[in-house]
Amino acid sequence: NILLNIKQRNEKNHTINMFREVSISNDTISVKFYRNEKIECACNFLMDKDAQGYIDLSDMNLTSCHFKGDVISKVSFLSSNLQHVTFECKEIGYCNFTTATVDNVIFRCRRLHNVIFIKASGECVDFSKNILDTVDFSRSQLTHSNFRECQIRNSNFDHCYLYASHFTRAEFLSDKEISFIKSNLTAVMFDHVRISTGNFKDCITERVELTIDYSDIF
């Protein structure tokens, strides 16, 4: 009823921002609703979990949500619309963004680990200055996206479409090789990267810029 009331009022007054500030703790989501930059109300929701024990935020329209908190863990955003969402937290772990729409998503985090972006799609996604540890980007389409100054460990970019994305000063620090097998890297910037091992087999590399500060790749 709270959500319905706010939705009805929102049709008359577009200054209400649904899910402006969201924090997640265990299986509870705390939401603050704002009107004209002031809190309209605050609510806690006990959320269902999926078969894997993840908080289930799949197939939802979460456009422009602002997720805050220390750690966001075990949340499924499967097939959700996350356009213009900001994640502002220390860490995101064991989350699933498979087939999610991620246009203009900003990750203001220190670390993402054990996160899945398989077949996620979007442009202008900002991962800059994050540690990306065991992140699966395979078969995703992340064009014009920002991986500047990331530390990338044990992550997979196979079959990705990364048109015009930037890895400026990224560090690829892995126990095993970083894999871009069969990815489309057209106009991707790998300038001043540090990389020890990598697999670029069968990639499209038209207009790629690659300058390596430290590498055993060759």
Predicted features, each with a name:
Residues 2-5:
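Extreme N-terminal basic, low-complexity initiation segments
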Residues 15-218:
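Tandem repeat scaffolds
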